[in-house]
From Swiss-Prot:
Subunit structure: Tetramer of two alpha and two beta subunits.
MF terms in GO: ATP binding; magnesium ion binding; phenylalanine-tRNA ligase activity; tRNA binding
The name this protein goes by in its record: Phenylalanine--tRNA ligase beta subunit
Family matches, as InterPro entries: aa-tRNA-synth_II/BPL/LPL, B3/B4_tRNA-bd, DNA-bd_dom_put_sf, Fdx_antiC-bd, Fdx_antiC-bd_sf, NA-bd_OB-fold, Phe-tRNA-ligase_IIc_bsu, Phe-tRNA-ligase_IIc_bsu_bact
Similarity annotation: Belongs to the phenylalanyl-tRNA synthetase beta subunit family. Type 1 subfamily.
EC number: 6.1.1.20
Annotated B5 domain residues: 401-476
Residue ranges annotated for the tRNA-binding domain, each copy included: 39-148
Cofactor: Mg(2+)
Keyword Protein biosynthesis set for record: yes
Chief subcellular location: cytoplasm
Cofactor: binding comment: Binds 2 magnesium ions per tetramer.
The gene coding this protein: pheT
Catalysed reactions, as listed in the record: tRNA(Phe) + L-phenylalanine + ATP = L-phenylalanyl-tRNA(Phe) + AMP + diphosphate + H(+)
Amino acid sequence: MKFSELWLREWVNPAIDSDALANQITMAGLEVDGVEPVAGSFHGVVVGEVVECAQHPNADKLRVTKVNVGGDRLLDIVCGAPNCRQGLRVAVATIGAVLPGDFKIKAAKLRGEPSEGMLCSFSELGISDDHSGIIELPADAPIGTDIREYLKLDDNTIEISVTPNRADCLGIIGVARDVAVLNQLPLVEPEIVPVGATIDDTLPITVEAPEACPRYLGRVVKGINVKAPTPLWMKEKLRRCGIRSIDAVVDVTNYVLLELGQPMHAFDKDRIEGGIVVRMAKEGETLVLLDGTEAKLNADTLVIADHNKALAMGGIFGGEHSGVNDETQNVLLECAFFSPLSITGRARRHGLHTDASHRYERGVDPALQHKAMERATRLLIDICGGEAGPVIDITNEATLPKRATITLRRSKLDCLIGHHIADEQVTDILRRLGCEVTEGKDEWQAVAPSWRFDMEIEEDLVEEVARVYGYNNIPDEPVQASLIMGTHREADLSLKRVKTLLNDKGYQEVITYSFVDPKVQQMIHPGVEALLLPSPISVEMSAMRLSLWTGLLATVVYNQNRQQNRVRIFESGLRFVPDTQAPLGIRQDLMLAGVICGNRYEEHWNLAKETVDFYDLKGDLESVLDLTGKLNEVEFRAEANPALHPGQSAAIYLKGERIGFVGVVHPELERKLDLNGRTLVFELEWNKLADRVVPQAREISRFPANRRDIAVVVAENVPAADILSECKKVGVNQVVGVNLFDVYRGKGVAEGYKSLAISLILQDTSRTLEEEEIAATVAKCVEALKERFQASLRD
């Protein structure tokens, strides 16, 4: 937000210079982005009056003028501005004046005519970029007065970054309140005298959406002169806040917006049919906006309508049909409180970001509307004339925000600040902030002011007290803590060790938001209810994630859209699963998840371009599981997951308990998410793996190992892992290694069957195994496979 320093000082004028004021505002939590003078450096420019204005005898586009600057005689000045005319009060740079850029004014002849000065435009004085003509001053501007003094150009524009919680500071009044509190000065508000109704004209107002619009004020003003010029003082204040003057009606509503932080809108009353209806838009309803674009509205968009059509997007943008134009004589002033949730996201949906939506999304003071209406009415009538009707107020008290009542405990205050502030000082700070304070024993009851939506809990009051007290006034205290060496179990597996392993395998760690798009999440976890946020950043970030896959897959799409087709990423973080048995109804599990897609290897002339498959990811996952020392207890079972390919996925079990999933993303989900090519994912519950098996020292056999290979034919649906597990189980004392080295389907193997080639490594720690013992153990394995899986040795 930009504002004029002098405008701020009209409300509160501390005895500090501009730099100190800017620093004070920053330390109060409103970061100052810049302080710039409102005009260039110049001197010798005064108010003058064009007494005579005649055509230059030797130039069609020049005029010869005589100008009164309050001296002994009139000055001859040649001017080329198209708006130069007799009787106009202007800014005159006299001989000896120095303009911005060190431009010195000297006596000269222009096309043969003497010129003893220059009539200046705004751009020539470094005030603005407007060079369309010379400055037109009011007819009562005192001749001979220094223009810097008359226009109050010894001023600065201060630009601040207002955080979303401080919507009250999106108006001069909010910044002034903070400066007044910090300097213990009274706030000098402009006198707003209510405008009595002089006519009975009204329009019927109906609010059909009280949750979205708890308060709506409307007032008819008839007989205005919309072509009346906006006073220079108002134009200058608007300009110094970065707003261009449009016309008197729009300028008045913008002025109230900047001064009080209350958005307003003016309708052409004669274009309203029947009356005002505040309602939600009809699905597919259209509205031509003030900028000429057509907006197609959704059913969740608030509109201001008449009895036949939508007139404006509530709290966002006005409509072209009902807008004020050069023919307007009667207006309806609107001043409303719209719920932030009813405005949030709607403007962005249509590519809009207006001053009104910016304020309504963050919250406007619900007690401000009557004051703003009276202020706007008075300014409008003073500038444009006209007569005002009564104010029509439609308020639904049940849906208006309630002021929070907060208890601040002395113990909490001292604990969080780390410094004792006297009771009377705490009370004074809270009252100066606008709170209604009741003192108790070692505590305060404070009712937050209506303009502070961010005061809700005890910590908010602690922050306010510390902020106003001054962070610089809180003494530095050394941290006092005992140095006690923590214990570390050898069985604890550090997540950092796992991350290092994945990094070594070419994965990159990412961190994604815990807030995800509920629509995308439903594609990945259909039918699973997620925790929805009451005040989301946006609609696309309104649900808490049920797994890390939602964010990871979005990251893959983001990279693929930027020509990064080989992606290997992982993430560790919490998922949030609704669970009635968990505290607060939400179970938070620490998860480890990863995604791979694209080529198996980086591009290289000596490496084939092979796409990653299920076994690439399964191999990486087994490396992770091997760090736990429990790989031999892990099973990969065929189990359906709606997000994964039914034939290329598996559930991961540890000691009979499911700990995760691995597999290829389901083709249908791949299509919906716009994934480019085969994408594989895994996810593990980390807490079920963090306790590793500590390796035990064991004797290494000094005797030779023996390898025997067998090929068994089993049904297609028999998992190879079960075959290997059975062999280990049968040969527990002598079989030290079992490996699957070939799978065959085809000639010699019946359809629906497969041949598994297995190597058995046999060894004893105390002696060399005899051939008869080896053969007996192999035979036991074969027999066990026949009995359990109906396996047969392949010929």
